[in-house]
């Protein structure tokens, strides 16, 4: 029996180490926008790193797909700092590229590149849940990852 581990690549774009929070409550950028990072354990060569996309439809017909990036939004109703809502990805500073990745991307790739695959992560087309007694839309690679794990389990 084959076992796959699908891991979210994160929802903070290339700013995983900063938790995606990029501004203070007055809107001034406080993050180091030159410090790119990827998420662990998604950078492990032993997992499938799940990125995010945004699906477009025309009625019930698929009309396209783009990289998931919903831009800056407030952290929560009680935290007015802005954070980035976008698929995680990039090049690991620590993990060596696995042989299956260098075979696909070429020998010049020396560090682990992620994500490996991507699935719908946009909040607008994500999942509807009940939260505090009311409907709530969720998205992110933390939703995409278990959805794809379920699909892989059926394959």
Description of each model-found segment:
Residues 1-155:
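Extracellular protease catalytic domains of secreted zymogens
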